[in-house]
């Protein structure tokens, strides 16, 4: 199912709600062909609004897709012997009480090597959570 569907809370074409499908256990992975950032946003929305653990929600965009395409032995979980592709994510509150938050990628590692470092946490706007 599409991660943007999770963000919107419904399908833009009137099809199955991804949130409902995940909650019922009929959707086991998320994708996005036009808004890749939706993958991280959807994980946090499912955790916050659908009472999924972060590990369950992240499996929808990591382990489960890796299994589906036959590369689970190489990627998809942090396991000895697998490639270490890691994102460090920080939730930034958009309101003082942090009721509305957005996930921000602060570091990215590919194959265990640092490939991205954000300076966003040093910026004075937003409310850290």
List PLM regions with ranges:
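His/Asp/Glu-enriched, well-ordered alpha-helical/loop segment
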Residues: 1-89
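C-terminal cap of metal-dependent C-N hydrolases
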Residues: 67, 80-129
